[in-house]
Amino acid sequence: MSNVTVSAFTVDKSISEEHVLPSSFIPGSGNIFPKFTSAIPKTAWELWYFDGISKDDKSSIVIGVTRNAEGLKHGGFKVQVFVIWADERTWHRDLFFPESVVSINESGVTDGIWKDATSNSSISFSCAGDLSKASLVFDVPGVVQGDMHLEALPGDTGLDTDARLGPSVYYVRPIGRASVKAQLSLYSSDATAAEQFSLGTSANGGMDRVWSPLSWPQVMTESYYLRTQVGPYAMQIMRIFPPAGSEDQPSTMARLYREGQLVCVAQHVVTREDALMTHDSLILSKQDNSDSEDVVTGGYRDKNTGYTVEFVEKGNEGQRWKFQVRHERIIWNTPTSRPGPDATGNTGFVEVLCGGTIGESYEGVGTGGQCELS
């Protein structure tokens, strides 16, 4: 019999009032198996995140699979499914499952299933031990059924770089650059038949693995996420601002690849005024082109229309890469505060980009997300 390690959670027994230490980060690994294996404390959370976007028609899919104490309110651990079609129609469900089981075998294959035995429904994922591929299966009758497949693109993985996002979060990209396919049947409450969603051969995306012993409000007050392919460049960004009153500095876990080669490893957030870059760094500034026609913004108080992204190689003669990011379509708007003129929220975007190093002007698309906590 093969050697299998299992982490089995039930929502009524696996959320702890006590302090629980996560297992250690494993350098060079995808760290896909849970870090809280027998119970998770109320402040902690774990996320398995998958996305894909078509460069041809800008259709996109985003999946978030979680373990955290939010499950107590809803009777299950959450899986979020977001879809946007080429015609900009969207579909979003937050689904909750009483059981969450993740296993890893002696070959390193990790399987996870979030399930509800009563309704005979589940959403599951599997990731190869060598991180060459991952897949998801959606089996929630009358809601969502289908599958999603990610295949790692050749080149550097970035797994041998620092995975810390500030002092309290680990942010790993087991499959940071992938070709993605998906075929889903999606049901709406007012529809008698399923709508079909297909993400074909022109789609790119990836898989992220994130965890922390602290809740998001304890970690940050604002964040921006981006994964994109722009000509020969692949870009991955997560940047957070610490809570008000914190002594922590803004943090990032940002990577830039060119033709599969990792060319900039940014853990530091800087400004253009910083004279000497002693580390690979990220400059991220908001754009406000609200006077232009057809601008897209989030649904809350932050009305930026996009970002300017600059990767800066360390040293006086370090190379720079600059990209303009424009919000093209909204995938979701989720509030993080009460309604009102000063309301905050979380918005997902289809992002359109252009840029490169000096003399380059490549174009591309990606998925982005910005969140502000009140």
Swiss-Prot record:
The keyword Isomerase applies. It is an enzyme of class 5 (isomerase). It holds the Pfam family DA_N. Optimum pH is 7. It comes from the Eukaryota. Its EC number is 5.5.1.-. Pathway: Mycotoxin biosynthesis. Belongs to the Diels-Alderase family. This is Diels-Alderase fsa2. It comes from Fusarium sp. (strain FN080326). The lineage of its organism: Eukaryota, Fungi, Dikarya, Ascomycota, Pezizomycotina. The gene is fsa2.
